[in-house]
Every structure is written in C-alpha cells, then in structure tokens.
C-alpha cells in the first residue's frame, strides 16, 4: 500500500509554475468572488489566495454581501471579463440560494473560466479537445500521471455524478482510453461494481462510505470527498484506515486530492494567461 502525498505533488507543481511566472513580463491575474460569509468557503478562498501569492500571481479577492442580487453579481463578472489584468475568474460555490449558480457560471468568459464549469469548456472536454478543465478531475489526472499509472483499458468506477467532480472525472478517464462506469445514489449493488474496479474515484459527500470489503485488492482508490464529523475531524468518503489495507495506492483526506485541485486551478490560470498572448 502506498499513500499518495497530494501536498508534496502539488508543491512540486507550484514550484514549476513559479519558475514560469518569474520569467513573465506581466503576472497572471486571478479574481475570486465570495458572496456571503460561509466559513468553509472563506477558508477555501484564503487557501487559493495564498497559493496564488506563492507562485507570483496577481490575486484579487472580491467579497460581496450575502444579499447581493443576481444583477449585481453578473455586473461584477462582466467587469472582470473586460479587465486586462485578470486572466482567470472564479466564483466560490455554493452561492446563496437566491442566486442562480448556472447563470453565474455561464456569465464568465469561457477563456477566463478557470474552474472549467462553463458549458463551452465542458463541451470541449467531452470532445477530447480540452482547454480549461474542471480542477478536481484534472488534479486527479495529475496524480495518475505522477504515480505512473497507465489508464488505457483499466476498469474505472466513478462514484458520484455531480457536474463538479463525477461527470468531468468520467470524461477525463474516457479521454485516457479507460473503461468507465459512473455510479450515483440510485446505483444497485454498488459494492459488486467496485469489486471489479482497477481504479475507484469517489466523490459523494458521505463520510467513510466506501469500505474495505468493497474494494478489489491492489486497486487504486482516489478519495475526492471531504466531510466533517461531529468531533470536528475531517474525513473523506472512503474509510481510509480499512481500505488502505487492500489498496495499492490511496489518497488521504485531507492532504490528497484537495491540494491537487488548487494546483490544477493555478495551472488553468497560467493556461488562460498564455491563451491571451
């Protein structure tokens, strides 16, 4: 069993990005919009801001009050779309319930959509002609590359069908010529499907759902979930302590997929910058 150190892999990627940024005349610019005062979202935004500063990006944090209207938010995005200093735009999700997240995502220029959620970027990913790829699934693909996994012909099961992780992850694996099964909350006999998998990627938001006896010995298990238990402990969707006994590679939570998601975000910002040159 090998534990995948996402922090170390991400640190190496950030160091390479910084070398590229140091040679540029203008620093890539990232704008992050946070609506409201959700504590978890504030932590995520702060982590992204710190990562940007570490690699030498220009970082702009925009805090909007929780009662911000749809029109006000769209106007802010339009200003950033037209700004020469800003190469990437990120609106921190989830948004307050009175705001339409889909409308907000579609308002971001596809060329500055560093989250990779705009329908144009999702369409390019599905056509295997990606430009800005969704960050979590891209970060997972970076992990596979770093640990030397050949995905061609591998049986891969993605547990979770969200637009943020599950669906883009399935597309990434298909583009890598893997054989992909995507499961959701209605999937019957999930454990039987997982027992056939060479690679399992989980993102369902259910703490420690995936158990040791669901996993084929020697498989690779990627945990993209993050949950907080009653005792304040952060855990993933995989029962790490038991599954690590049978997996050949496994990501911890925290310290696995999370740092890689931010590394992918930084790389997307650099790609967006280079696309304007």
UniProtKB/Swiss-Prot annotation:
One protein family per Pfam: THF_DHG_CYH
The EC number(s) this enzyme carries: 1.5.1.5, 3.5.4.9
Positions annotated to bind NADP(+): 160-162, 185, 226
Keywords, alphabetical: Amino-acid biosynthesis, Histidine biosynthesis, Hydrolase, Methionine biosynthesis, Multifunctional enzyme, NADP, One-carbon metabolism, Oxidoreductase, Purine biosynthesis
GO terms under cellular component: cytosol
Keyword RNA-binding: no
InterPro entries reported in the protein's UniProt record: Aminoacid_DH-like_N_sf (IPR046346), NAD(P)-bd_dom_sf (IPR036291), THF_DH/CycHdrlase (IPR000672), THF_DH/CycHdrlase_cat_dom (IPR020630), THF_DH/CycHdrlase_CS (IPR020867), THF_DH/CycHdrlase_NAD-bd_dom (IPR020631)
Domain of life: Bacteria
Pathway: One-carbon metabolism; tetrahydrofolate interconversion
Reactions that this protein is recorded to catalyse: (6R)-5,10-methylene-5,6,7,8-tetrahydrofolate + NADP(+) = (6R)-5,10-methenyltetrahydrofolate + NADPH; (6R)-5,10-methenyltetrahydrofolate + H2O = (6R)-10-formyltetrahydrofolate + H(+)
GO biological process terms held by the UniProt record: L-histidine biosynthetic process; methionine biosynthetic process; purine nucleotide biosynthetic process; tetrahydrofolate interconversion
The keyword NADP belongs to this UniProt entry's keyword annotation: yes
UniProt similarity note: Belongs to the tetrahydrofolate dehydrogenase/cyclohydrolase family.
Record note on quaternary structure: Homodimer.
Protein's name according to its UniProt entry: Bifunctional protein FolD
Gene name for this UniProt entry: folD
């Amino acid at each position: 069993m090998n534990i995948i150190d996402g922090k170390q892999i991400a640190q190496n990627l950030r160091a390479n990005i910084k070398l590229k940024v140091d040679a540029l005349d203008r620093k890539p610019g990232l704008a992050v919009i946070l609506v409201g005062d959700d504590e978890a979202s504030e932590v995520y935004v702060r982590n992204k801001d710190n990562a940007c500063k570490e690699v030498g990006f220009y970082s702009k944090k925009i805090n909007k009050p929780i009662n911000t209207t749809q029109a006000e938010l769209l106007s802010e995005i339009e200003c950033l779309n037209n700004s020469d200093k800003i190469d990437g735009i990120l609106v921190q999700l989830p948004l307050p319930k009175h705001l339409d997240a889909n409308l907000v995502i579609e308002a971001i220029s596809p060329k500055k959509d560093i989250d990779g959620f705009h329908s144009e970027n999702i369409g390019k990913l599905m056509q295997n002609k990606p430009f800005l790829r969704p960050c979590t699934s891209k970060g997972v693909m970076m992990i596979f590359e770093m640990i030397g996994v050949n995905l061609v012909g591998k049986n891969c099961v993605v547990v979770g069908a969200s637009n943020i992780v599950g669906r883009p992850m399935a597309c990434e694996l298909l583009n890598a010529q893997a054989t992909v099964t995507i499961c959701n909350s209605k999937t019957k006999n999930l454990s039987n499907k997982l027992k056939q998998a060479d690679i399992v990627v989980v993102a369902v938001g259910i703490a420690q759902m995936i158990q040791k006896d669901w996993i084929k010995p020697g498989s690779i298990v990627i945990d993209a979930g993050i949950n907080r238990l009653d005792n304040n402990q952060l855990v993933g969707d995989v029962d790490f302590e038991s599954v690590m006994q049978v997996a050949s590679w496994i990501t911890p939570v925290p310290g696995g997929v999370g740092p890689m998601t931010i590394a992918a975000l930084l790389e997307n910002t650099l790609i967006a910058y280079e696309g304007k040159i």
